[in-house]
From Swiss-Prot:
This is Na(+)/H(+) antiporter NhaA. It comes from Legionella pneumophila (strain Paris). The gene is nhaA. GO terms for cellular component: plasma membrane. Na(+)/H(+) antiporter that extrudes sodium in exchange for external protons. Belongs to the NhaA Na(+)/H(+) (TC 2.A.33) antiporter family.
Amino acid sequence: MNKSGSFYNLETIGGILLFIAAVIAIIIANSPFRVGYEYFLSINGSVSVGNLSITKPLLLWINDGLMAIYFLLIGLEIKREVNRGILSDKTNLLVPALTALAGLIFPALIFIFFNAHHPVYLKGWAIPTATDIAFTLGIVSLLGSRVPFSLKILLTAIAIFDDIAAIVIIALFYTEQLSLLSLSLALVFTLILIGLNYFKCRRISVFMLFGVALWIAVLKSGVHATLAGIVIAMTIPDEGKESMLARLEDGLHHWVVFLILPLFAFANAGVSFVGLDASMFTHPVVLGIGLGLFLGKQLGIFLSLGYFVQFKKFLKADKVNLAQVYGIALICGVGFTMSLFIGSLAYQNYDLSLMPMVKIGVVLGSFIAGLTGFLVLKLKQQ
């Protein structure tokens, strides 16, 4: 991976900032400032260009707007890795792809087990399937040499496939009623972006101009607007280390790590425990998410990756053992950012009263998975 040292350092900082932002949000949500916090996120913001006007609460500007930039960065990273990184060597694809798939199936099955008889609850089946790359790499980096670098690379590859799966899930299962006019405009802007690449336009400002137009069209189409970020990323030229893709990725990475993801965590992680009783923790949605992240992820990833390590001698040269694999499998249960995001999509048009359950399940499941994974890897070394 290019610039691997700076990448992992940045992800470490990002994981720490995410944790701080989430803790602050939880503290505020359980304090007298809770009303102000909720009011702040509900403030409407408007953007007008000519006759076109978009008005949304601040929370949705973050989730639909800023998160599109995050998905743009994800798309750029995936394209880079396919062209000349981890995913460019086809022999490196099978293990992380199958591991990520198993890490998706088991959490989904656990969620379905608890919510099969509740049609609305069941719409959140994908919530525990996600892995937060910033948090996971942040936790792993705190362990230093206890985790072989090759295992960190593998974790990154698994997270990339996890992101690809999340993109497909959002596109297929969390798309509203479609507007053919807006979709047609989105297709036109996509073709323009492809044309800019083909005719060797290398001005980021031109791509971003039509990228914003594409985002607006996708926003109005019924497809979730964040997917515009992925489409834009796939059209960005990539011709080597100093390419437009590399420059845009470098420029966005700091904004995403230091602003967008912490702001998303602050806006979405504010779960209030005021007035909660023990029965809330046995709610089917909470159990499905919490156990899906903690139990489902570790089962899926440990069984699949453990098989390759134990029986196919995968990573044998790096002396990776099953205890390290189990620790990594646990840490992959930190779904946080993407789990909260999918949760907001799953229930936003059905039952917003379920969002506190989503937050409780994601926070508890991610915390327990991350802590136990950290302890397993730390104690194994000792």
